């Protein structure tokens, strides 16, 4: 006897439609149940969140009073400086450092250019110590000159430094030819 292949029984279309509608109803009921349970859980979560926020605030106050560091970057207060405060901070920083303010190589090139213009020789030789010494003297002179010019601007009830302040400071010092750059040429 030959075996027949297994074939499942076919259901009628009306039977399938009824099962689909039953499963949809069950899904809707399950969704409604889970939402109502979720709301209860959501309320509990909200309560926990509020308690966590209160705990964080209390620990933050404790940390601030005890002088501990901040917990995270969000806890830090962003400080905004008033206009001019950063400039004054930089001035104090530059006053404390003994290093030179002008870069060495551009200053050396300027000195070599001026020395070739003033002398008939094509190039004078400079030692590195002489260039550094000259640079320190020039920077010291410039700082004191600008301090005097700033005092003239403040006397005129201005904060902005103008060329007339520089000219007045030079005139008080007894210098001449300050209005323009005076570089002698070869004779």
Swiss-Prot record:
The keyword Kinase does not apply. It is found in: Nucleus; Chromosome, Centromere. Residues 1-12 have a biased composition (Basic residues). This is Histone H3-like centromeric protein CNA1. Histone H3-like nucleosomal protein that is specifically found in centromeric nucleosomes. Replaces conventional H3 in the nucleosome core of centromeric chromatin that serves as an assembly site for the inner kinetochore. Required for recruitment and assembly of kinetochore proteins, mitotic progression and chromosome segregation. May serve as an epigenetic mark that propagates centromere identity through replication and cell division. One of its GO terms (cellular component) is nucleus. It comes from the Eukaryota. Component of centromeric nucleosomes, where DNA is wrapped around a histone octamer core. The octamer contains two molecules each of H2A, H2B, CENPA and H4 assembled in one CENPA-H4 heterotetramer and two H2A-H2B heterodimers. CENPA modulates the DNA-binding characteristics of nucleosomes so that protruding DNA ends have higher flexibility than in nucleosomes containing conventional histone H3. Residues 34-43 have a biased composition (Polar residues). PANTHER family: HISTONE H3-LIKE CENTROMERIC PROTEIN A, HISTONE H3.2.
């Amino acid at each position: 006897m030959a075996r027949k292949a297994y074939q499942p029984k076919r259901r009628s279309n009306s039977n399938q439609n009824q099962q689909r509608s039953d499963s949809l109803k069950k899904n809707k009921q399950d969704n409604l149940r889970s939402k109502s349970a979720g709301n209860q859980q959501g309320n509990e979560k909200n309560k926990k969140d509020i308690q966590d926020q209160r705990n964080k605030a209390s620990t933050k106050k404790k940390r601030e009073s005890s002088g501990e560091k901040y917990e995270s970057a969000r806890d830090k207060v962003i400080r905004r400086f008033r206009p001019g405060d950063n400039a004054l901070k930089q001035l104090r920083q530059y006053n404390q450092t003994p290093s030179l303010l002008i870069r060495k190589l551009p200053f050396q090139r300027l000195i070599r250019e001026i020395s070739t213009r003033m002398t008939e020789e094509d190039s004078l030789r400079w030692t590195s110590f002489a260039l550094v010494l000259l640079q320190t003297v020039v920077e010291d002179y410039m700082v004191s000159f600008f301090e005097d010019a700033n005092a003239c601007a403040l006397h005129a009830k201005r904060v902005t430094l103008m060329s007339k302040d520089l000219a007045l400071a030079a005139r008080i010092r007894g210098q001449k030819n300050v209005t323009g750059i005076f570089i002698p040429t070869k004779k």
